[in-house]
Swiss-Prot record:
The gene is atpD. It holds the Pfam family ATP-synt_D. GO terms for biological process: proton motive force-driven plasma membrane ATP synthesis. It comes from the Bacteria. HAMAP family: ATP_synth_D_arch. This is V-type ATP synthase subunit D. GO terms for molecular function: ATP binding; proton-transporting ATP synthase activity, rotational mechanism; proton-transporting ATPase activity, rotational mechanism. NCBIfam families: PRK00373.1-2, V_ATPase_subD. Belongs to the V-ATPase D subunit family. Keywords: ATP synthesis, Hydrogen ion transport, Ion transport, Transport. Disulfide bonds: none annotated. Produces ATP from ADP in the presence of a proton gradient across the membrane.
């Protein structure tokens, strides 16, 4: 791991030690966030799978009923029955926060609270299979919106997981090792400088003692 290009001073050493503390703290927080994101994501994927199977089953039933209705009714009669719906739907889109990720919340309201208004026709000229298909589609709509909400949430969480994982890896495998190695390097340099200073001081001391000894000998000779 390459060290940073810094001056090997005590001030720089103190600064880098503080950066290392912050990096380790940030790494722990991001790792905890990543673990929770993964937990939320996997739970969402499991629920999404179960809901998708339910929606597909209901849509398959509605499709089969429509096929039977088409077989027993004329094309003109089927088109006329479905031409003028009694209900309209309003979709409300909001968001909720999951681990700092804004995910969609989809809710709908109908223009009428009368459940029979889902049928845009009279029952005299239509088949029971068409009624069943309309009823199934009416029931499956909330699940389809929930499924769309889950799939978009899963996509957004997956993106956040990838982004968080890159940040965790950058700290764990690049920044923290680089800071650690640079701190070791500066500490080693400072130790070398200190040993060098001690050696120089010892030499100066020896020289002063030698000069004092020589001066004393000259005085004795005089």
């Amino acid at each position: 791991m390459a060290i940073m290009r810094v001056n090997p001073t005590r001030m720089e050493l103190t600064r880098l030690k503080k950066r290392l503390q912050v990096a380790r703290r940030g790494h722990k927080l991001l790792k905890d966030k990543l673990d929770e994101l993964m937990k939320q994501f996997l739970d969402l994927v499991r629920k999404n799978k179960e809901l998708r199977e339910k929606v597909e089953e209901m849509l398959m039933k509605a499709h089969q009923d429509f096929l039977i209705a088409r077989a027993v009714m004329s094309s003109e009669g089927l088109e006329a029955a479905l031409m003028l719906p009694k209900q309209s739907i309003s979709l409300d889109v909001s968001t909720q926060n999951i681990m700092s990720v804004e995910v969609p919340v989809l809710k709908f309201t109908t223009s009428s609270s009368d459940e029979s208004d889902i049928y845009p026709y009279g029952f005299a000229s239509t088949s029971g299979e068409l009624d069943g298909a309309i009823l199934t589609l009416s029931k499956v709509l909330p699940y389809m919106l929930e499924l769309a909400q889950m799939e978009k949430s899963s996509q957004l969480l997956a993106q956040e997981i990838e982004k968080t994982r890159r940040r965790v890896n950058a700290l764990e495998y690049v920044m923290i090792p680089q800071l650690t190695e640079t701190i070791k390097y500066i500490s080693m340099k400072l130790d070398e400088n200190e040993r060098g200073n001690i050696t120089r001081l010892m030499k100066v001391k020896d020289m002063m003692l030698e000069q004092a000894h020589n001066f004393k000998e000259k005085l004795n000779e005089a």
